[in-house]
C-alpha cells in the first residue's frame, strides 16, 4: 500500500512539473492547451510536449478523439482521464489529458473532435483545433 502511495505521489509530481512549463524528463519543453486555445497557431520545437486538457461529460457516451494527426509531425504519447474536482460524481464531469510530442519540423493541424464513437467523427458536437508550427 505504501509503495502505491509513493508511486502515485511521484507520478503526480511529474505531471505537475510538466504542467508548470518546466522541462520534461527528456529535457523537452511542455505547453498546456485548453478549449479556449482552439483556433490558435502555436510555436513548438521538435521534441516539445504539447499537453491538451479538455472537459467532457462522463456517462453520456461523448468523448474527445484526435483526428487526422500527421504522424510524421506529432505523436500521441499518453492519455489519461481525471475528475476536474475533488468530488468524484458518477457520470459527472471528466477531464481528458493528452500529451503529444512534436517530431519533424513543419506545420500540422492538431484536431480533437467530441463525439460518440458509435456515431463517428462526422457527428461531432464540438471540436478543438490548433495549428502546430514545429521548428
Model-derived features with residue positions:
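Boundary at the C-terminal end of the N-terminal hydrophobic targeting segment
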Residues: 15-19
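Aromatic sugar-binding surface patches on proteins
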Residues: 90-97
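Interdomain boundary/hinge segments at the C-termini of tandem beta-sandwich modules
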Residues: 132-134
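Short, solvent-exposed loop/linker segments at beta-strand-coil boundaries, enriched for Pro/Gly
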Residues: 60-61, 68-86
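Bacterial N-terminal signal peptides
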Residues: 2-13
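Glycine-centered tight-turn and secondary-structure capping sites
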Residues: 100-108
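Short acidic/polar inter-strand loop motif in beta-rich domains
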Residues: 115-122
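N-terminal edge beta-strand
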Residues: 23-52, 57
